[in-house]
Amino acid sequence: MTTISAPSEPYRAVRWWLISVAALIALMVLVGGATRLTESGLSIVEWKLVTGSLPPLSAAQWTEAFEAYKKIPQYRELNAGMSLSEFKEIFWWEWSHRLLGRFIGVAYLLPFLFFLWRGGLSRELKRRLWLLFALGGLQGAVGWWMVASGLSERVEVSQYRLATHLVLALLIFAGIVWTVRRLKERAQIAAPARLRFTSALLLVVTFVQIYLGALVAGLRAGRAYNTWPEIDGALIPSAERLWFETPWWRNMFDNVLTVQFEHRMTAYALFVLAALHAFDAVRSRAGLAASGALWLFAAVSLQAVLGILTLLNQVPIGLALAHQAVAIAVLTLAVMQTERLASRQSAETQPRVVPVSQPG
């Protein structure tokens, strides 16, 4: 049987496919952010995987959708008297968010099946791609679980479920970014072990900050305490105000003041850690890791400025979405920096021998 050696970049097509999916996920997160900021997330009160792909196409269908929305607490307590045209405005945001989610599922699954049929994927890569697909399916379920939390007793979705939904989306995104980088041969960067540790720590703190940011969003905490650097009249609020709920740990997730304070403090920690990592990388002459650290520090700095401006201006949609977009950029750079400094031994990059006479 005649065979040919795999090309120098055996996974070039796979990489571009995954890059496209990652870009779609980033767009999905931003559309989700706009859906939340416009209070549109509860405008569709049911989940229909297939038939839900089509919006209302007649006046009767629009009336039916609007009447269903009128039955939930959000309409009765916040939007009573809303017109049909106003309902359509919030409906389109949520419908677009769900449609994009379906499109991402198709954009991932169909090429994945093709690459499986074509062959040439390593066992490790196939396991990773199946895991990402499973997480994508879980994300769809988590999205409906989140929406369901606001349909019976609340006028908004649970901040816990919102944070879970966002973090899972960006965990999938980060997994794809890591996988894309692992699919291309790169020389191992000679750098001190402490740089590998601080890059990984930066990635962990970035995820923690994203989670806290989602809690802030879910509690509408960005519309309170709109001063900086003071919060509630002081640099550090009083313990009585921070910890008045019982049990004490609930304040970390439910107390608007405490959650915003946590988000601020974590932002400061992330800024300092990024600065120290960049200084150490440059001083250590770590090559590409030094430039990567500087880019990461620049993104964290920009994110801090945007966060302050968003707070001081009481969360205008444009600034809030810019803040969310730069958060995705910070996460991307943190993943790239961690992968750059990690061990380069990877099963995904092993060349394969592909038979000419058959697909795989």
Swiss-Prot record:
A biological process from GO: heme A biosynthetic process
Coiled coil region boundaries: none
Biological pathway: Porphyrin-containing compound metabolism; heme A biosynthesis; heme A from heme O: step 1/1
The name this protein goes by in its record: Heme A synthase
Keyword set includes Chloroplast: no
Function, in words: Catalyzes the conversion of heme O to heme A by two successive hydroxylations of the methyl group at C8. The first hydroxylation forms heme I, the second hydroxylation results in an unstable dihydroxymethyl group, which spontaneously dehydrates, resulting in the formyl group of heme A.
Subunit structure as annotated in this protein's UniProt entry: Interacts with CtaB.
The UniProt record lists the keyword Acyltransferase: no
Residues the record lists as binding heme: H263, H323
EC primary class: oxidoreductase
Location in or out of the cell: Cell membrane
Similarity comment: family membership: Belongs to the COX15/CtaA family. Type 2 subfamily.
Organism taxonomic ancestry: Bacteria, Pseudomonadati, Pseudomonadota, Alphaproteobacteria, Hyphomicrobiales
Topology relative to the membrane: Multi-pass membrane protein
GO CC annotations, alphabetized: plasma membrane
Keywords linked to the UniProt accession: Cell membrane, Heme biosynthesis, Iron, Membrane, Metal-binding, Oxidoreductase, Transmembrane, Transmembrane helix
Catalysis performed (reactions): Fe(II)-heme o + 2 A + H2O = Fe(II)-heme a + 2 AH2
InterPro entries (alphabetical): COX15/CtaA_fam (IPR003780), HemeA_Synthase_type2 (IPR023754)
Gene name tied to this protein: ctaA
